[in-house]
């Protein structure tokens, strides 16, 4: 999944899994 924060903040757990 690609939450909005993935682009803006990369703070949520989902973002960490995808971004990092």
Swiss-Prot record:
GO terms for cellular component: extracellular region. Its main location: secreted. The keyword Secreted applies. Keywords: Cell wall, Secreted. It is found in: Secreted, Cell wall. This is 35 kDa cell wall protein. It comes from Phaseolus vulgaris.
């Amino acid at each position: 999944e690609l939450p909005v924060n993935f682009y803006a903040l990369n703070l949520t757990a989902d973002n960490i899994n995808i971004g990092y």
